[in-house]
Amino acid sequence: MASSMAPAAAMAILLLALLMPATLCSRSGPPSSKHGHGGHAKRAPPPASPVVPVAPQAAALVRATCNSTAYYDVCVSALAADPSSTTADVRGLSAIAVSVAAANASGAAQAAAALANGTAPLAAAAAGDGTVQALLRACAGKYGDARDALAAAKESMGQQDYDLATVHVSAGAEYPQVCKALFRRQRPGAYPAELAAREEALNKLCSVALDIIALLTSSPASNNNNS
């Protein structure tokens, strides 16, 4: 009996020996691979957030609108700097243009006051000249008037009174010219370069604003569809 079972037992042991490596490989293979990749997964950065499409620097309407102005590059730069310009209609673009001009006038008023008070980096030249300081204070006032005129223009545009808005923007462009004229009469050559640059920028910004407002006065109905 024992002798007859010996071959069977030997065969069973042999089969078991053959099957065990395959069984162990089938059980250990995936976990090993899983642990290997899992270790890297823990150290890997989290999945990147979905990429949000970036709006072009100048939307089609911005470019088309700026083509109607005398200073295309200034117009595109001013409007595209405001994120809302990519979804604004022409009336919205005109409001942005006026706001940019008002910000320029406000900055010029502060710069002129700083030069007059001796707190600006380039104020040393005016420190000992009472006339220049008085002129700078007058310039600060004129740029302040320009800022207020442009703020009034924006209010008029909100009421869709584009004719009055045009008057205010035109006034905003003219106030700084008084500053330059005062310097030419009383201190030729002493007009600060910073104010000269700001005056030129404000003049161009006001021109852009006026050109865009003109689009509203020429065909207001077509520009109120998105309001």
Swiss-Prot record:
Task: Please describe the organ and tissue distribution of this protein's expression.
Answer: Expressed in roots, leaves, culms and flag leaves.
Glycosylated residues are N67, N104, N117
Q: Any idea which UniProt keywords this protein has?
A: Apoplast, Disulfide bond, Glycoprotein, Growth regulation, Secreted, Signal
For this chain, the annotated S-S bridges are C66-C75, C139-C179
Q: Which Gene Ontology BP terms does the record give?
A: plant-type cell wall modification
Pfam families assigned: PMEI (PF04043)
**Quick check: keyword Glycoprotein in the entry?**
yes
Disordered as annotated region, ranges: 28-50
- Which residue ranges run through the membrane? none
Q: Which compartment or compartments is the protein found in?
A: Secreted, Extracellular space, Apoplast
Q: Name one GO cellular component term.
A: apoplast
Provide the leader sequence positions: 1-25
Query: Gene3D superfamilies attached here?
Result: Invertase/pectin methylesterase inhibitor family protein
Compositional bias (Basic residues) spans? 34-43
MF terms in GO: enzyme inhibitor activity; pectinesterase inhibitor activity
Q: Which domain of life does this protein belong to?
A: Eukaryota
Q: What induces it?
A: Induced by cold stress. Down-regulated by drought stress.
Q: Does the keyword Glycoprotein apply?
A: yes
What is its biological role?
Pectin methylesterase (PME) inhibitor that inhibits PME in vitro. Functions as a critical structural modulator by regulating the degree of pectin methylesterification and the physiochemical properties of the cell wall components.
**Could you say which protein family the record assigns here?**
Belongs to the PMEI family.
Q: What else is known?
A: Plants over-expressing PMEI28 are dwarf and have shortened culm length, due to increased level of pectin methylesterification.
Database matches in PANTHER family: OS01G0111000 PROTEIN, OS02G0537100 PROTEIN
Q: Which NCBIfam families match?
A: PME_inhib
Q: In its UniProt entry, what is this protein called?
A: Pectinesterase inhibitor 28
Organism name = Oryza sativa subsp. japonica
